[in-house]
């Protein structure tokens, strides 16, 4: 799924698909689904995001996927283009984009299986 979200007042083209968790694991040496589960648990228990890093990583990868040639190779370079708390403030939109993408994948799977 492709789309655009706003981070720090800037329109950022994003792409999320089945390869996103694979890119996440290869680049950050961490399991994407486990990281997202931890974030969801923290949000449920405390209402806060305690660790911003998985969100920064996800946002970077989804911004990198549609245009890898014009996206900085280092996440630090990409993040430097935004104000300090902008990823945190955009995290609901980042999650919403990922969830929409994941929902579309589940929808397609149901249609293929005839359910």
For the regions a language model picked out, list residue spans one by one.
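Short histidine
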Residues: 19-22, 26
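Short linear motifs in exposed loops
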Residues: 15-17
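Charged interaction scaffolds used for protein-protein
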Residues: 1-11, 30-47, 65-115
């Amino acid at each position: 799924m492709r789309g655009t979200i706003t981070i720090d007042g800037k329109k950022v083209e994003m792409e999320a698909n089945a390869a996103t968790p694979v890119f996440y694991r290869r680049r950050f040496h961490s399991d994407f689904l486990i990281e997202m589960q931890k974030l969801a648990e923290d949000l449920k228990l405390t209402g806060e995001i305690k660790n911003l890093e998985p969100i920064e990583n996800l946002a970077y990868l989804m911004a990198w996927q549609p245009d890898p040639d014009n996206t900085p190779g280092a996440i630090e370079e990409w993040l430097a283009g935004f104000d300090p708390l902008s990823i945190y403030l955009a995290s609901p939109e980042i999650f919403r984009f990922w969830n929409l993408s994941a929902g579309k994948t589940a929808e397609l799977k149901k249609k293929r299986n005839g359910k």
